[in-house]
Amino acid sequence: MTYKFYDTCSLLLKVDNLWEDNVVVVLSSITLEELENIKTAANKDPDVKYAARKLAHELDEHFGDGSYTVMIWNNDLMEDLVETHLPITNDSKIIICADAYMNLIEPEDEFIFYTNDICCKHMAHLTLECPICSVEEEKYDYDGYKIIQMDDEEMAEFYSNLTVNKYDLYIN
C-alpha cells in the first residue's frame, strides 16, 4: 500500500486530483484546523478559500471509505516535537504527525510526505526518513505583455469599452 501524507499547502494544490487507486491520503488534524481557518479568514485570497471549501466537501464525500485518514495531534506528539528541538509551529506539528503515522504502517508499505512550503520541507528533511516531494503546480510564465491582434471593428469596440477587461490583462 502507498500512503501519501499531505501538508495543508500541498493538499490545497492537489484538491482537483487527490484520489488515486491503492493510495491512502493521510493528513494531520492540524491541517483540518488550518482548512477551517482558511475558509473563514477575511484576509485570504478567494481562490484559496474556495479550494479549502472544495477540499472540505471532498473529504466529507470520502469519509469512512478508507481513501484517507487523519492523524490526530495529541500531547504525546507534543513531547516528540519538543525532543526534536524544532520550533513549535503548525508545520512542525504536521511533520511530527507524519513521523508518528509512518511508524504505524508496515515496513514494506510506501510512505511519501508532500509539502510545497519551503520551510516545512527543510524541517521535514531534518526529521523524516522518507521521500519528501512537492505537488506539481501549474506553471505560468508571465512575460509582462500579451500580443493581441484586432481588426478595425474589434479596435473600435475595445476603445469604446475601456472598463471591460475582455483580454484578461493585468492592470498596473
Report residues per predicted region.
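Active-site-proximal, substrate-binding regions of enzyme catalytic domains
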Residues: 2-112, 118-172
